[in-house]
Amino acid sequence: MVYTYLIIALTRIYFLCCKTILRQKEGYRLLKNFMDWLQNKILPPMSKVGNNKYLVSIRNGLVLTLPAIISGSVFLIVGNIPITAWANFIKPYMNMIGVAVNGSFGIISLLAAIGIGYELSKELGVDPISGAGLSTMAFVIVSFNDKFKLDTNNFSSSGLFTAIITAMISVTIFNFFIKKNIIIKLPDGVPTAVSNSFVSLLPGFVILVLFWFIRMPLHIDINLVIQSIFHPLLFAMNTLPGILVYTFLVSLLWVCGIHGDMTLEGIADPIFLQFLAANGTAFAHHQPLPYATAAGFSSLMVNVGGTGATITLVVLMLFSKSKTYRDLGRVAFPGALFEINEPVIFGFPIVMNPLTMIPFIVIPLILATGSYLLIHLGLMNAPVAMVPWTMPPIIGPLMATGWDWRAAVWSAVELVLAGAMYYPFFKVAEKGMLAKEKTSTD
């Protein structure tokens, strides 16, 4: 009940602030100055972060894990359809379904080592196949336990950060040897595949010795060390303040014209994917879900209909008095239905627009707060399965939470809330557009 009153209070404060800002030119001028500051001070460094070779490689390399996660999620969803007749029918086959779930979720770190090694090698201009192989070797070496047995538990979500670190170190060493020309060269007539294998021989041996020496003679559990280093970050991203900071940064970057989701994916995706894999495994074994902010939380429960919940803005445009907005709404609606909102962000526009900056940033914060609290209080499941981010509102949360009908109801409520919050700003924009249309007609 306290959380409910908190959300209501925040919403009232939001509308009061909106009313004050929209009625005063001074407030609008301050927003314009703030936008100029963002463009001059924040945009350049954040662009560099988004283009960092290592972060780009992590983002692109993790794509290799998605087929396994999505395929395993299909089995997870099918095996937990909340229909009594179906549950009775599928019960004898649940162990078989568990094999598919464990066999897909259980190797995401191994796939990440392969994918990141490949992508980083491409970014650095060295042979990607060799880079992927060396990264995988390093990750497997550090996955042996003190009893000299391979611990395949590290191949699951728990070893994801280890896979990332070992891949980056391995490819960096590989790149150093290649660029410094410390390699075994073969005659020009030798096939490329054979030549590349000999080129990677010396760096491969150094990588093997390095990780073997750390893991075996020194008895350092690299996976445990890395987990302890990243534990504060993992803890923070599963808290309400942590997810609010992330949500704020994504929206703020979009307002500045930077793809916020893509810029932060290299940092956030390993965390959210690890959360999702852990939730999926817990759900399959009928255990409590450990993480509220797993992959799907932001895309399906916060940014309904695209970042900023802009599908509601599109609906407002469809019924606008302005012909310009009606036409834009017709063009943007099909994409917005499937979470694609670039036509709105750049067409309305939202980018570098002081008027729409407030709702675009604040609405996701309110929706994130509501979603997190509902999950935290046990009133709605957290995401347990990976569904495509293009899944429409209501349907996407329903499937991602393992057919929790409460998630679908909350998604519908979110659409109403977002629409109500966009409405006053849209009416101001509509008034200005109608004046422009009248002037052009005259």
Where are these predicted regions, by residue range?
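Alpha-helical membrane segments and immediately flanking helix-loop junctions
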Residues: K53, I108-L120, G133-A138, H285-L355, ...
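Early transmembrane hairpin of solute transport permeases
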Residues: S47-N181, V351
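Short juxtamembrane and helix-loop transition motifs at transmembrane-helix boundaries
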Residues: A87-V99, V171, N223-F230, L289-A295, ...
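Membrane-interface helix-loop-helix junctions at boundaries between adjacent transmembrane segments
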Residues: P128, F144-P241
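Generic multipass alpha-helical transmembrane bundles of integral membrane proteins
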Residues: F205-S320
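Hydrophobic core segments of alpha-helical transmembrane domains in multi-pass membrane transport
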Residues: T65-N80, L111-E119, S135-N145, I164-N175, ...
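Transmembrane alpha-helical segments and their short flanking loops
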Residues: L31-V49, G280-L289, V314, V331, ...
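Cytosolic juxtamembrane amphipathic/interface segments immediately preceding
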Residues: Q39-G61, M94, P187-S195, P343-I345
